[in-house]
């Protein structure tokens, strides 16, 4: 296993990076929504030019995205933290988009951190919900992938995590009026 995965979620990072490499050549400039994070470093180590947003409240001010540039936007575990992801998706300053979100699990409650109101999930999508949201916001889906997230614990719910997909990735391109 590569050393970058010793601390981070190995499967999620590996899958996300593989999708990114499939649709964006090295050297692509990427706006990674959210503050700088460990996966921002992974993308840079793989040859991408990465900038991040600065912690703005994108629900209240999605128009601030127009101040950023990038050939591609990544929103990796970001949309579920937004009250209004539709407004953000409309304002993205690129023609290519890679999104990952946690899927809604029928056997688990939505994630909530009582100590940090920014670290809560307003949405845990079903795949069709994210697809509809993207299409309504002007994006055409080119690729989709789901994967499980085993947690290595004992119990009924941890067992289900071996079989029920937890993450959903979508690569999309902005629709044009041509």
Language-model features and meaning:
Residues 79, 88, 103:
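Flexible, active-site-proximal loop/turn residues at the rims of small-molecule/cofactor binding pockets
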Residues 72-78:
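A short beta-strand submotif of the Rossmann-like class I SAM-dependent methyltransferase core
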Residues 73, 97-98:
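Short, well-ordered beta-strand core segments
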Residues 98-99, 170:
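Short hydrophobic-aromatic micro-motifs
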Residues 1-72, 86-93, 117-132, 142-178:
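Conserved N-terminal segment of class I S-adenosyl-L-methionine
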Residues 83-87, 109:
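Short N-terminal helix/helix-N-cap motif within the alpha/beta-hydrolase-1
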Residues 99-123:
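Short, glycine-/aromatic-enriched active-site segment of Class I SAM-dependent methyltransferases
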């Amino acid at each position: 296993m590569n050393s970058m995965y010793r601390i981070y979620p190995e499967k999620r990072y590996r899958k996300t990076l593989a999708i990114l490499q499939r649709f964006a050549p090295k050297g692509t400039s990427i706006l990674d929504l959210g503050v700088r994070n460990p996966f921002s470093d992974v993308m840079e180590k793989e040859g991408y030019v990465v900038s991040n947003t600065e912690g703005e409240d994108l629900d209240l001010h999605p128009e601030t995205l127009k101040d950023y540039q990038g050939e591609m936007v990544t929103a990796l575990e970001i949309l579920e933290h937004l009250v209004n992801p539709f407004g953000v998706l409309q304002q993205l300053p690129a023609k290519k988009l890679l999104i990952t979100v946690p899927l809604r699990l029928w056997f688990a409650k939505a994630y909530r951190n009582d100590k940090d109101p920014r670290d809560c999930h307003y949405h845990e999508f079903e795949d069709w919900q994210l697809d509809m949201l993207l299409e309504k916001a002007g994006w055409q889906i080119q690729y989709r992938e789901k994967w499980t997230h085993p947690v290595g614990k004992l119990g009924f719910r941890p067992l289900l995590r071996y079989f029920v997909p937890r993450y959903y990735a979508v690569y999309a391109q902005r629709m044009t009026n041509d």
